[in-house]
Amino acid sequence: MSQDSQLTTALAEAAATAGYAPSVHNTQPWRWRVLPDALELRSVADRQLTASDPEGRLLAVSCGTALHHARLALAAQGWRAVVERLPDPNDAELLARLTDLRPTTVDPAAMRMVQCMQVRHTDRRPVSDEPVPPTAIQEITRAVTAEGCRLQILDRDQVLEVAATAGHADTVEAEDPEVRTELAYWTSRADTGTGLPAEVLPEQPAQTTVPGRDFGRPGNLPMGPGHDRMAVYAMLHGDEDERDSWLRAGEALSAGWLTATRLGVSVVPLSAAVEVPGTRQTLRQLLSGLGFPYLVLRLGIADPAHSGPPHTPRLTTAQVVDTSAVR
C-alpha cells in the first residue's frame, strides 16, 4: 500500500472513530470529508438545537469532542497532523481541517485513549459513596488545561449556587414550548442512530444536589437510592466566548472525559445552565468574571454493584464520513 493510500485510509478510520464522541442530546452534529491530504470537519445545521442552542455553542462543543477524538485516532495510527480551526471565514460550516499529515511513531497513550472512547458513556445515576481520588482530579484537570481550557473545582457554597442556577434554568426551559418540543424530538429518535433512548434516561429524578435535566418524560434507567455526596462538581471554562473557543472547549472536554474514563471516574456534563443567557451569566459570576463558562461537570465513582446504562446509538460511518474525494 502506498503512503498516499495509507494516509487516506488512516483519515477515514480517524473520522469513523470520532463517531464515538459525546454530543449534546446525542445529536452528533458533525460530518467529515476525507481529502487526499486532509480531513475536514463540518457542522450539520439539521442537527443543531435551534431552540436551546441558537448560537451554536453546544454544537461547536460537540464537534470539538469529535475533533479531539479524530486527533487521537490519527496519533494512535502513527500520524501527526496540524489543526486549522475555522479555516475559512466564508464557510461557517467548516469548523476544522486536519492537514500537513506526517508519519510518526505510534503514540501508546493515544492508543489507550482510543480504547477508552469505546467504553466511555454518560451515566446519570447518582455516584457511589467512594470519593474521587485527588490525584485523579489533578490528572483530569491537567488534560483539560493541555487543550487550552480550565477546570475550576467548585467548593460547597459554589455547588449550592450552581444547584439553584441549574434549577432555575430547567424551569425557564420547561416554560418554553419550543425547547420542550425540541427535547421531545431528541428523546424519541433512538431508532435513527441519534438522540437519547429511554434506557439512558432516568425513570425518576435522581436525589442529587445539582438537579439533572428534566427530559419531559420518564425513562427506563433506575436511579437507585444513592446521592451525590461524594461527587465533585467542576466548571469547564475559558478566556473567550467565541466559536473558536467553543470548539476548543469540546476538545478539552474530550481530553478530560477520556482521562476520567481511563481512571475509572464517571463524568456527567450539565449543560442546561449554559443554555439560558441569564443563568449562564450567573455561572460567569462564580468565575469572578475572569472567564466564560462552557459546561458544568459532575465527576464521581459509579456504583459497581449496578450495571450502567447502555451506550447511546450512533449514526453509521456512511452517514457521517464522506470519502467521495478519495474513491
Regions found by a protein language model. Give the residues of each.
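Acidic, surface-exposed loops and disordered segments
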Residues: M1-R327
